[in-house]
From Swiss-Prot:
Its EC number is 2.3.1.180. GO terms for biological process: fatty acid biosynthetic process. It is found in: Cytoplasm. Residues 252-256 are annotated as: ACP-binding. The last Arg residue of the ACP-binding site is essential for the weak association between ACP/AcpP and FabH. NCBIfam families: fabH, PRK09352.1. The gene is fabH. Its main location: cytoplasm. Keywords: Acyltransferase, Cytoplasm, Fatty acid biosynthesis, Fatty acid metabolism, Lipid biosynthesis, Lipid metabolism, Multifunctional enzyme, Transferase. This is Beta-ketoacyl-[acyl-carrier-protein] synthase III.
Length: 324
């Protein structure tokens, strides 16, 4: 049978770091207040000449090098983002052109913080169906451009960045105990929660980009409560359970949410990859950034069982179980 094997990862961050103390100079907050509630110490902010596209290009190039491939080996590019360079055409098309790819196809996926999980799942479907042999999946965001920097409840949480992964279709034995690649995926959404996390603008309504708005306590409650269902479904689909995990790579929204989710699932803290302290919440870039960090520092190794999960505005949420 065919499985989608992840054979390369990459990441990119803007040059500018923004510490909690620096934020405290223009909004009523403090380092201790932010750390206590979120676990975030700093985040990276894109400069004027850094964009969702430029960060995505950089992350993609690193992933290609990591995989020992060139852009000629890629059939499809899927970009997960809520902060594209333009309303249209897609930022994925811009990245495709910048990388020198004139064959294949590319497009954007918008599922906010769950975007990378949704994009991976779509890429997996293309590979298993034979539509593509190799897919470059990118999560890239510049959320600093849609933040209200006077709102301390949101501006302290988010940062900019990009992460990328390459999926390749490979023939495997069909044994989940040893097969490398994506073993299962589960996606969900519920539009009843639109008012809890959203941008208050759009081309069809206000003709503006709008600012990010969030009901933090509501998001926290639902993040811990609903994400575990797709995780349980992922394990059930292959007859496994969380105790078999080597690594848990969750959406890096808030350290308290991550810890509460891991506790609910019975996952030990030493198996949880946490980068929110250094990156903040980078939305669709969060999971691939954390994944690339753990691969590059040697924590995640071939054969490891890894769970990726995320929840985003809408709400949208999903999980991917993969053997590295």
């Amino acid at each position: 049978m065919i499985r989608s094997v992840m054979c390369g990862v990459g990441s990119a961050l803007p040059k500018k770091k923004l510490s909690n103390d620096e934020i405290a100079k223009f909004v009523e907050t403090s380092d201790s207040w932010i750390v206590q509630r979120t676990g975030i110490h700093q985040r990276y902010i894109a400069s004027e000449n850094e964009t969702t596209v430029s960060l995505g290009i950089e992350a993609a190039q690193v992933a290609l090098t990591n995989a020992g491939m060139t852009i000629k080996d890629i059939d499809c590019i899927i970009l997960a983002t809520s902060t594209p360079n333009r309303t249209f055409p897609s930022s994925a098309v811009e990245i495709q052109h910048a990388l020198g790819m004139s064959h294949g196809f590319s497009f954007d996926v918008q599922a906010v913080c769950s975007g990378f999980i949704f994009a991976l799942t779509i890429g997996d479907v293309y590979l298993r169906s034979g539509e593509a042999k190799r897919v470059l999946v990118i999560g890239s965001e510049t959320f600093s451009r849609i933040l209200d920097w006077k709102d301390r409840t949101t501006c302290v949480l988010f940062g900019d960045g990009a992460g990328a992964a390459i999926l390749e279709a490979r023939e495997v034995e069909g044994n989940v105990a040893i097969d490398r690649g994506i073993l299962s995926t589960k996606l969900r959404s519920n539009g009843a929660h639109i008012d809890k996390l959203y941008a208050d603008g759009g081309p069809s309504t206000t003709q503006t980009i709008g600012y990010l708005r969030m009901k933090g306590q509501e998001v926290f409650k639902h993040a811990v409560g609903i994400v575990t269902d797709v995780i349980d479904d992922c394990f059930a689909a292959v007859g496994m359970n969380p105790s078999q995990l080597d690594w848990f790579v969750p959406h890096q929204a808030n350290k308290r949410i991550i810890e509460a989710s891991a506790k609910k699932l019975g996952i030990k803290t030493d198996k949880v990859v946490i980068t929110v302290d250094q990156h903040g919440n980078t939305s669709a870039a969060s999971v691939p950034l954390a994944l690339a960090t753990a691969v590059q520092d040697g924590r995640i190794k071939e054969g490891d069982l890894v769970l990726l999960e995320a929840m985003g505005g809408g709400f949208t949420w999903g999980a991917v179980l993969i053997r590295w």
